[in-house]
């Protein structure tokens, strides 16, 4: 009778293995940390288009490349070119301001408190509609977005369109041009 109970317990637990995480987590940060508002993880200050703070809050290095989190502070009515991520999903949460997102053939208008999910492999862009705005956004998995932002931030001159496409592709992004 004990053997039957043992087998029932073991076999009954097998479906629970689907929820187990077998990833090697040895490279993840194992201690809590905070990043102050307006600051980037590791003290790095990244700017979008050389002006708008776009700082890493949680690095892919912290999560074994499973997730990265960024804070964007928009100081004007701008946004990225139409593009597509080959390997990452994105989630945007609007803290302040108003934004228009175009995802595939759908258009969404978001304001403070709204969230949007952008699946990988679907072309998308957004533009800030107010003079000031703030977003928190997540990429899953982290991929090479931090490196992409660092590379773009380090450029001293505006690169050619071909150079922009090459840099994007090196980081898992297909640049499709203006919105």
Regions found by a protein language model. Give the residues of each.
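Histidine-centered catalytic micro-motifs
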Residues: 81-87, 125
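C-terminal segment of N-terminal export signals and the immediately downstream linker at the start
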Residues: 20-51, 154
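Short acidic-glycine-tyrosine-enriched beta hairpin
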Residues: 106-120
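Short, conserved beta-strand element in jelly-roll/cupin
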Residues: 73, 86-101
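Acidic/histidine-enriched, glycine/proline-rich intrinsically disordered or flexible terminal extensions
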Residues: 151-179
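Ligand-binding loop in jelly-roll beta-barrel domains
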Residues: 120-146
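N-terminal export signals
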Residues: 2-25
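A short glycine-rich, His/Asp/Glu-containing loop-to-beta-strand
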Residues: 46-82
């Amino acid at each position: 009778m004990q053997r039957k109970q043992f087998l029932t317990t073991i076999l009954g637990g097998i479906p629970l293995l689907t929820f187990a995480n077998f990833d090697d987590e040895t490279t993840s940060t194992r201690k809590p940390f905070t990043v102050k508002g307006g600051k980037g993880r590791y003290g790095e200050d990244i700017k979008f288009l050389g002006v708008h703070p776009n700082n890493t809050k949680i690095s892919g290095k912290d999560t074994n490349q499973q997730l990265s989190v960024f804070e964007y502070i928009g100081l004007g009515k701008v946004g990225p070119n139409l593009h597509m991520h080959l390997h990452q999903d994105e989630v945007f949460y609007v803290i302040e301001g108003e934004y228009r997102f175009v995802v595939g053939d759908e258009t969404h208008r978001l304001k403070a408190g709204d969230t949007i999910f952008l699946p990988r492999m679907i072309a998308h862009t957004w533009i800030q509609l107010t003079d000031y705005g703030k977003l928190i956004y997540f990429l899953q998995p982290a991929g090479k977005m931090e490196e992409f932002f660092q590379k773009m931030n380090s450029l001293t001159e505006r690169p050619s369109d071909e150079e922009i496409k090459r840099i994007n592709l090196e980081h898992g992004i297909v640049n499709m041009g203006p919105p």
